């Protein structure tokens, strides 16, 4: 799962928000699990305070496509959503070009081999085990997370 939350605009999953804010035109139809950083923190505390030990859990709120994610982020920023579907060929070309740019400029690549591959893959995660362990817990919706994170970033950018 990809953890979504406030953070450095240029790193990690928060860079997805920056790309959409800047109206990056490309999207993929890959699917991944997404979860709010606050849910991860709450569940970590709940696990530490419980009798649960020697267990592994998948912490994921929702499985959605990158296209859906980007459309939701764009709506939160009142920006145009990505509108060009990336193909495996273009994704492969993109990470290679980014790697060349990095070698010559030292600037961190926007797309890596791993991110290109992940963006095209359909990875779905089941959160049932953690919900069985903590039936009182409910995940924050990805819509709510996106609205909160976008509002926070909008405020940092000092734009309405």
Regions found by a protein language model. Give the residues of each.
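NAD(P)-dependent short-chain dehydrogenase/reductase
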Residues: 1-34
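Substrate-positioning beta->alpha
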Residues: 11-12, 28-48, 55
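A hydrophobic C-terminal alpha-helical subdomain
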Residues: 27-28, 39, 88-134
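Short aromatic/basic micro-patch
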Residues: 34, 63, 124-125
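Mid/C-terminal beta-alpha module of Rossmann-like enzyme folds, strongest
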Residues: 43-110, 141-142, 147-160
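C-terminal helical cap and adjacent loop that interface with cofactors, partners, or active-site loops
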Residues: 121-127, 135-136, 143-153
């Amino acid at each position: 799962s990809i953890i979504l939350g406030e953070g450095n605009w240029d790193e990690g999953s928060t860079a997805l928000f920056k790309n959409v804010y800047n109206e990056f035109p490309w999207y993929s139809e890959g699917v991944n699990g997404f979860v709010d950083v606050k849910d991860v923190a709450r569940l970590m505390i709940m696990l530490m305070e419980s009798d649960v030990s020697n267990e592994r859990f998948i912490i994921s709120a929702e499985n959605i496509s990158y296209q859906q994610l980007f459309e939701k982020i764009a709506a939160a920023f009142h920006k145009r959503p990505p509108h060009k579907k990336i193909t495996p060929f273009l994704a492969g070309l993109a990470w290679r070009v980014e790697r060349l740019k990095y070698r010559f400029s030292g600037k961190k690549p926007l797309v890596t081999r791993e991110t290109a591959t992940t963006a095209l893959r359909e990875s779905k995660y089941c959160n049932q085990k953690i919900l069985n362990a903590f039936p009182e817990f409910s995940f924050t919706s990805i819509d709510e997370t996106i609205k909160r994170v976008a509002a926070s970033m909008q405020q940092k950018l000092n734009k309405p």
